[in-house]
Every structure is written in structure tokens, then in C-alpha cells.
């Protein structure tokens, strides 16, 4: 299990609670060569990929509806992104797929101009992201304040939880019961069974129960078309001229910025969760390449998905590229050969798994009375504004930008006082 440790440094003495790995963890366990030579590690990484793939399905389908595209196409784009970033990405075990924040950016363009503009917009966004990485601009991430990071994590936990409410808030005792049973299985089974991830046990057992009992419940299949087979490559249906450029460039810039911001913030968070480092430059280049390939399948582009990344890293104990590669392969099999079986998974079960992810994502330490009392008021205000802006807009990038802007607008005198308080707290230690 993960240990929760309050991490205080001279630069950031307050608002951070870090989930650290147990002492027995070897830093070499995140290397592919080590994993493939160890049956135990290979099984662990593969099972982590299985539950991650299952956790991706409902969100990707929901986000495709927001963007106005076929769910099957978005799922295939997620397969492409997951496989591509497992090889080219700069952060091991970080899951990348078609994401909600990107869907929110693409949706207005699709509704106004049509789906034919998705491909050129995504291709342009991918090129921008590659240039961002080549030019080394990912290093600007170090200027994001810790209070904004804390707000980002807390807002994300809230957004993940709120997204699950429609799937378990029901007058049907069976739906509520499945949700509660999922919570109990995921929380209690690891005490007795450690070889198999508890979310996978919950999905298998409760899906078998609903199918064999003949109960009619909302399932994954109700969220969108799950026809079998592979979709073909998307053809460019619009001319490459100035009119097309005028339509796609605002969307492409937004996709590139939002995707990079969320991916790099997630990479930074996973760095802390696993006490390892990542290459932000490589992640930027890999994300751009992945989005270009995903766009060729008509996908809505994507970025790192922190909820599913936490499923992989914490629930599945995934640490290497093997886990995300396995997630992509399992998702490919589910979408093509086993789409009918996958469609029978109850949404209440997946909602239970993601609700626990939301609870584990939220930084509860940041709201403890002792933390609020000792933390500089400016940091608390910035954190709360970041949360409020993110939850109200449903866009993590806007929330982070709002927090950064508020921090930048703080009077110089208040900034000096904030710095002095941090220095004093460090000396007291």
C-alpha cells in the first residue's frame, strides 16, 4: 500500500501531502527490462493495464458525446494515444487518452462548423505540441506555484466525483446497492487478496451477477455505439486554404495548450506520487505525435487522464511503460473483439471505482484546520480560486490559469510577506 507523508521543504513548507512508495519498492521496477524478466512484476503491470483500460471506457465514451463524435472512434483514438505514449511519452505509467478538457475545446467548433474540421485542427495541435517540446518550453512548468497545483488536484477530484453522480444517484435500490458493493469490494478485498487488483474483481463479480440475474440496468453499452470491428483512417474532407485555417487555428491552439498543461501537470503530480522523475520535453513531443496519429482515426485528440493514471499507479501498482502498453492493448481487444461483453458492464460499478479514485485524488491535508491555520493566507486564497474556477468552468486549464493570474496580481508587499512566512517556518523546523 501507499504511505501518506507530509512533505515540507524550505520552498513549500505547507500545502503538500505526498503518497510515497513503501521502502521495499525498487527504483528499477519501472524499467521495462526488469518487468519482462520478472513474472510477478509482469503480472502486476498487466493487471494494472486491464483495470486502467476498463476505467477509460466510460469517460472516453462520455467525452465523445460532448465533442459530437462517434464513441467508437474516440475509443480507437484512445488506443492509439495509449500505445503511442507508452513508447514515446516522458512519464512512465501515465495514461493518455481522449480527454474531457480537450472535448470541451473541440465541441463548439464541431457544432458550429462540422466534424470534418476535427482532423486538420488535431493535426495542427499535434505539430504545435511537438514544437513546444523541441523548443524546451516545458521547463516553464517549474514556475507554477504549489498552491495552484494543490487547487488543480482538489478540483480534479471534485470533477471526477461529480461526473459519477448521475450513474449511482438513483431511486433504484439495485443501482445504489451495486455502487456501495463496489466501494466495499475495492476498499476491503486488498486486505485479503493482493495478487489481483480489487477494481478488476469488482467489475468481474458484479457484471456476472447482473448478467446471470437478468437485471436490467444502465450499462456501458447504453453510453454509445459499441459495434465490433476497426474503424478506418479518416480522410481530409476540407480544402487546406486560408478559410479552413481561420476556422481551425483557435481550436488547434486551445487543444495544444490545454493538452500540454494537463499532461505536464499530471506528470508533475505522478513524479511526486512515485518519487521518480519524468522528461517534460519528451512528453510534449510524444503527446504531439500521439495526437497526430489519433487524429488520423477521427479522434478528438487527448492528453493525460489523471483519474485513470491514479487507477494505474495506485490501485493497479503500475510503474512502467508495460502497464500503459497493456492498457492500450486490452482496450483494443475490448473495443474490437469483446465489445458485446464490455457493453454489459454496469455503469454503477465503474462509478464506484471512479468515486474512490476521486476521494484518493483530493488532497485532504490541504483543508485540515492545522494546515489552514499555518499556511499563508495568500496560498489558501489562490488554491480556493483555482478550485472554484475549475469546477465552475469544468476546465482544468482555465482553473490553473486563473490561479496563476491571481498569484501574479498579488501586491508585491504581500508576496514579500508570504516569502518571509515561508522562511520563518523553515527556520522553526
Question: Predicted regions: what is each one?
Answer:
Residues 73-82, 116-127, 282-291, 327-332, ...:
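Alpha-helical transmembrane segments of multi-pass membrane proteins
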Residues 5-11, 18, 24:
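Acidic, Ala/Val/Gly-enriched low-complexity intrinsically disordered segments
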Amino acid at each position: 500500500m501507499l504511505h501518506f507523508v507530509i512533505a515540507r521543504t524550505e520552498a513549500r513548507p505547507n500545502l503538500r501531502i505526498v503518497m510515497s512508495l513503501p521502502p521495499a519498492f525498487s527504483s528499477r521496477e519501472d524499467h521495462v527490462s526488469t518487468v519482462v524478466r520478472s513474472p510477478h512484476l509482469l503480472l502486476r503491470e498487466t493487471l494494472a493495464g486491464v483495470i486502467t483500460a476498463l476505467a477509460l471506457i466510460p469517460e472516453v465514451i462520455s467525452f465523445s458525446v460532448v465533442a459530437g463524435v462517434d464513441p467508437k472512434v474516440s475509443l480507437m483514438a484512445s488506443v492509439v494515444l495509449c500505445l503511442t505514449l507508452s513508447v514515446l511519452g516522458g512519464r512512465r505509467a501515465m495514461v493518455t487518452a481522449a480527454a474531457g478538457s480537450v472535448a470541451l475545446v473541440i465541441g463548439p467548433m464541431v457544432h458550429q462548423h462540422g466534424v470534418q474540421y476535427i482532423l486538420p485542427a488535431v493535426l495542427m495541435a499535434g505539430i504545435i505540441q511537438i514544437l513546444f517540446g523541441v523548443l524546451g518550453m516545458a521547463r516553464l512548468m517549474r514556475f507554477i506555484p504549489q498552491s495552484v497545483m494543490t487547487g488543480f488536484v482538489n478540483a480534479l477530484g471534485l470533477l471526477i466525483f461529480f461526473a459519477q453522480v448521475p450513474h449511482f444517484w438513483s431511486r433504484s435500490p439495485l443501482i445504489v446497492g451495486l455502487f456501495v458493493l463496489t466501494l466495499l469490494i475495492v476498499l476491503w478485498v486488498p486486505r485479503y487478496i493482493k495478487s489481483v487488483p480489487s477494481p478488476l474483481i469488482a467489475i468481474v463479480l458484479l457484471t456476472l451477477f447482473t448478467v446471470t440475474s437478468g437485471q436490467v440496468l444502465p450499462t456501458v453499452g447504453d453510453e454509445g455505439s459499441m459495434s465490433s470491428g476497426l474503424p478506418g483512417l479518416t480522410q481530409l474532407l476540407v480544402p487546406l486554404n486560408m478559410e479552413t485555417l481561420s476556422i481551425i487555428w483557435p481550436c488547434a491552439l486551445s487543444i495544444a495548450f490545454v493538452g500540454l498543461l494537463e499532461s505536464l501537470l499530471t506528470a508533475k503530480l505522478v513524479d511526486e506520487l512515485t518519487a521518480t522523475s519524468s522528461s517534460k520535453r519528451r512528453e510534449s513531443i510524444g503527446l504531439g505525435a500521439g495526437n497526430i496519429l489519433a487524429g488520423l482515426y477521427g479522434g478528438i485528440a487527448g492528453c493525460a487522464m489523471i483519474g485513470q493514471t491514479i487507477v494505474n499507479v495506485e490501485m493497479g501498482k503500475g510503474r512502467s511503460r508495460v502497464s500503459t502498453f497493456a492498457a492500450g492493448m486490452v482496450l483494443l481487444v475490448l473495443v474490437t473483439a469483446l465489445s458485446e461483453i464490455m457493453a454489459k458492464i454496469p455503469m454503477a460499478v465503474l462509478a464506484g471505482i471512479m468515486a474512490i479514485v476521486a476521494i484518493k485524488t483530493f488532497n485532504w491535508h490541504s483543508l485540515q484546520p492545522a494546515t489552514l491555520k499555518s499556511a499563508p493566507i495568500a496560498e489558501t486564497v489562490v488554491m480556493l480560486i483555482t478550485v472554484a474556477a475549475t469546477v465552475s468552468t469544468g476546465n482544468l486549464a482555465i482553473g490553473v490559469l486563473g490561479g496563476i493570474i491571481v498569484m501574479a496580481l498579488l501586491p508585491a508587499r504581500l508576496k514579500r510577506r508570504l516569502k518571509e512566512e515561508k522562511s520563518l517556518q523553515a527556520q522553526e523546523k
